[in-house]
């Protein structure tokens, strides 16, 4: 198993952090780390403007502690019914295609929010206002599903503080709701959280050779697959996240091999409740330029103007996605390939 991806040597903290029990707990967990006061977790110039050559070092050594200000819920309809206020953002990993790094400077190490009680209370109130889910949808037929980790990986966050354990415990006692998060990291600590079926883990997977190039600092794909039965026995609902689907010569053969491995490893109990989401690659010009400075090999696969087209995002950024018409054909082929190897795996959504 890969070693834990953090070796915290400096902690940037907002003024109010030590007023919270969770803040004091985290500081005690990393007693040797240098403490650097900052006015806001959003504005740390030495992280935002750092040399891309230090990209991985900042992710490994830096931790930001702050107080979550906006406790808002956004409708989703894809991975979840709602995006919950996050207990963190940023990530210790460095997946070459990841959009998270566009939001807060390219390094974007983990920022952990210490006001977890307020985040949990706001979530419980929001769930109570929804009442029972009367109309089934692709997200879940009965429960309102809340994405808890839109901008990070909660399996890694669980090695920093008790925030993830607290959120799993919260949803254990919310009869009309489930928590959900995607992960590329295997953390055995999650096995002791007793989710009782009220937290859905979406295990992110791609062919191993592709992951070695693109999923930097993550758990190997074989370890992620091996962890699925254990997580299910521990009480988690397990779905699969095939994301991003990156097209290259021989993609059908390598994805077919992945589906065969899953079919061989997963027990019947997992297959009976399995569903998947499929997300075709979308890349970003700004991230492309950063990647060229630290991981140009990845850009040979991610930046493909010959089969991609530009799309301007709502925020004004220039994205590249697979060309209209072609993308639909490739997506159909992907779904057909999945169905031929894993006919029991329902596709919740694909785009």
Describe every region a protein language model picked out.
Residues 95-98, 203, 240-243:
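Conserved, mostly hydrophobic/aromatic
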Residues 1-81:
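Flexible, acidic/Gly-rich N-terminal and inter-domain linker regions that tether
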Residues 148-155, 186-190, 199-218, 244-249, ...:
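Conserved radical SAM core fold
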């Amino acid at each position: 198993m890969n070693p834990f991806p953090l070796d915290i040597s400096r902690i940037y903290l907002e003024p109010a952090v030590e007023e919270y029990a969770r803040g004091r707990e985290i500081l005690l967990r990393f007693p040797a780390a240098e403490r650097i006061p900052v006015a806001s977790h959003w504005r740390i110039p030495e992280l935002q403007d750092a040399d891309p050559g230090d990209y991985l070092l900042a992710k490994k050594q830096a931790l930001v502690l702050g107080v979550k200000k906006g406790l808002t819920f956004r409708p989703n309809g894809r991975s979840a019914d709602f995006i919950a206020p996050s207990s963190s953002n940023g990530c210790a990993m460095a997946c070459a295609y990841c959009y998270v790094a566009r939001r807060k400077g390219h390094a974007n190490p983990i920022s952990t929010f210490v006001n977890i009680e307020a985040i949990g209370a706001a979530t419980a109130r929001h769930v109570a206002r929804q009442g029972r889910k009367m109309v089934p949808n692709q997200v879940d037929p009965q429960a309102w599903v809340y994405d808890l980790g839109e901008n990070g990986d909660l399996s890694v966050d669980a090695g920093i503080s008790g925030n993830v354990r607290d959120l799993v415990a919260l949803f254990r006692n919310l009869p009309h709701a489930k928590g959900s998060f995607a992960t590329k990291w295997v953390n055995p600590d999650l096995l002791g959280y007793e989710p009782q079926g009220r937290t859905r883990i979406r295990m992110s997977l791609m062919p191993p050779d592709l992951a070695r190039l693109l999923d930097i600092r993550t758990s190997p794909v074989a370890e992620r697959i091996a962890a699925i039965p254990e997580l299910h026995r521990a009480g988690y609902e397990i779905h699969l996240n095939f994301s991003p689907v990156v097209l290259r010569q021989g993609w059908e053969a390598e994805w077919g091999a992945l589906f065969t491995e899953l079919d061989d490893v997963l027990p019947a109990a997992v297959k009976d409740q399995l569903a998947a989401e499929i997300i075709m690659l979308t890349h970003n010009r700004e991230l492309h330029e950063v990647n060229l400075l630290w991981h140009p090999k990845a850009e040979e696969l991610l930046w493909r103007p010959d089969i991609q087209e530009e799309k301007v995002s709502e925020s004004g950024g220039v994205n590249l996605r697979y060309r209209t018409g072609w993308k639909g054909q490739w997506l159909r082929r992907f779904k057909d390939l999945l169905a031929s190897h894993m006919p029991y795996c329902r596709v919740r959504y694909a785009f």
